[in-house]
A protein has these predicted regions:
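Gly/Ser/Thr-enriched, mixed-charge loops and adjacent short helices
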Residues: 13, 106-230
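Phosphate-binding and adjacent anionic-ligand microenvironments
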Residues: 234, 271-448
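Proline/glycine-rich low-complexity loops and linkers
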Residues: 124-159, 164, 250-323, 330-331
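Short glycine-centered, acidic/aromatic-flanked micro-motifs in structured strand/loop junctions
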Residues: 45-47, 177-179, 249, 333, ...
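Short glycine-rich phosphate-binding loop at a beta-alpha junction
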Residues: 39-47, 174-176, 277-283, 418-420
């Protein structure tokens, strides 16, 4: 059976790996699956890619053909779909987006009734249907055919929700926003304007093909220059669907997800709002984050890479803050998934309440030099479990001791082994990574 869903939904080049036929069938199965005992209600959002409209129509056709009602949020963010599912009694949410990928890619992300990424068993059933392993589903007829409903009001309610969160307004503060020509273009400025910030926005003119192109959280250098050149107090960059956020302080320094978790974790702990005094991270967070959390008497948990796993850990243990270095940050009091705009509001609240600049708050965390090398291999499992690779990794880990670490893991979406080392200097990082890669090369595991 084919494996279509990865760590972040069904994603690939539009009409190459992910086709309108796939989207129609996903709609057919989802509409049938959730309509077993009642008429299913499914809410759909999309980002600004040209192909997002095409996939939206295909999904709606599939859903309504199976008897489900499809509610359209139109261009919006992934977290707004999650919010709508949780608060408006929908059975399921669908976001059409490939997040930070280039415009020619797209994806289908499914959210369960709690607004979180859908269970793996449901994805497996959809994959079986896509492969023809499940018999044809019945078509709705007459009045049982589903309706298509304009639900732009749901996006407006989400905006109101965001505005209600900060404890104070941001009056007088000059805030730069890089919307990546993506979903946040329709939302972010109105939120900050309502909170009385002086808002400066770039890359908020989507044309269907410019999403993430030299802009947004994956091209943070654009916002760095903009903040410094315009004398702004702070800046925030989002990705295509605005479920992640990277910040920039007034000096142009990048504040990534690890530093954001430190700043917000310390602030929430001081406020008595950090449940269990614990921050949930992934194995890719910087060693400096862990040492800084320990210094401030905070605990931490580590999960596999992916905000899906962070969210699961937070829900199981009732934690209030977690996230990834990449900027997926979850504040469980307000959201079930990573939310870039919410994250920027919480960073702003910490700065305003503590009467401090982001530069001052973030510099308390020392970042350890980190080197990540992606190695293309013929077979990920074979490469990772090779006895000589295992031996060199253990040897390097022993040498690093408590002043560094090594992590070797498989990519969830590509034929890559990721070799990551953190240590006291860049030179040590390079030396350790080189040794591991040379062993992989000598073992004939690497492909060009």
């Amino acid at each position: 059976m084919g494996k279509y869903f990865g760590t972040d939904g069904f994603r690939g080049e539009a009409n190459v790996k992910l086709t309108v036929d796939h989207a129609f069938k996903v709609g057919r199965y989802v509409g049938w699956y959730y309509g077993g005992e009642h008429k299913a209600k499914i809410v759909i959002g999309k980002d600004t890619r040209r192909s997002s409209y095409m996939f939206e129509y295909a999904l709606v056709a599939g859903l309504t053909a199976s008897g489900a009602d499809a509610y359209l949020l139109h261009v919006t963010t992934t977290p707004s779909v999650s919010y709508a599912v949780r608060t408006e009694d929908f059975d399921c949410g669908i976001m059409i987006s490939a997040s930070h990928n280039p415009f020619y890619d797209n994806g289908i992300k499914l959210l369960n009734g709690n607004g979180q990424k859908i269970e793996a068993e449901v994805e497996t059933r959809i994959e079986a249907y896509l492969d023809g392993l499940i018999e044809d589903l019945p078509l709705a007829t007459k009045e049982d055919i589903g309706r298509t409903v304009d639900f732009a009001s749901g996006r407006n309610r989400y905006i109101g929700h965001l505005i209600s969160i900060p404890s104070r307004d941001f009056k007088g503060l000059k805030v730069g926003l890089d919307c990546a020509n993506g979903s946040s273009s329709a939302i972010a400025k109105s939120v900050f304007d309502a909170l009385q910030a002086k808002t400066y926005v770039i890359n908020n003119q989507p044309d269907g093909t410019n999403i993430n192109t030299n802009c947004g959280s994956t091209h943070i250098e654009v916002l760095q220059k903009y903040v410094v050149d315009n004398g702004l107090d702070i800046g925030f960059a989002y990705d295509g669907d605005a479920d992640r956020c990277i910040a920039v302080d007034h000096k142009g320094n990048v504040v990534d997800g690890d530093k954001i978790m430190y700043v917000c974790g310390k602030y929430l702990k001081e406020q008595g709002r950090l449940k269990g005094d614990t921050v949930v991270t992934t194995v890719m967070s910087n060693l400096g984050l862990y040492k800084s959390l320990e210094r401030e008497s905070m605990k931490y948990e580590q999960t596999a890479v992916g905000d899906k796993y962070v969210a699961e850990n937070m829900m199981e243990n009732d934690y209030s803050l977690g996230g990834e270095q990449s900027g997926h940050i979850i504040f469980s009091r307000y959201a079930a998934t990573g939310d870039g705009i919410l994250t920027s509001l919480m960073v702003m609240e910490a700065c305003v309440e503590k009467k401090a600049t982001l530069c001052d708050l973030a510099k308390e965390m020392k970042v350890y030099p980190q080197l990540l090398r992606n190695v293309r291999v013929a077979d990920k499992k074979t490469a990772r479990e090779n006895s000589k690779v295992v031996a060199i990794v253990k040897e390097v880990a022993k040498e690093l001791g408590t002043d560094g670490r090594i992590l070797v893991r498989e990519s969830g979406t590509e034929p890559l082994i990721r070799v990551m080392v953190e240590a006291g200097t860049d030179e040590i990082c390079h030396e350790k990574v080189d040794r591991v890669v040379k062993v992989m090369e000598a073992e004939g595991l690497i492909v060009d």
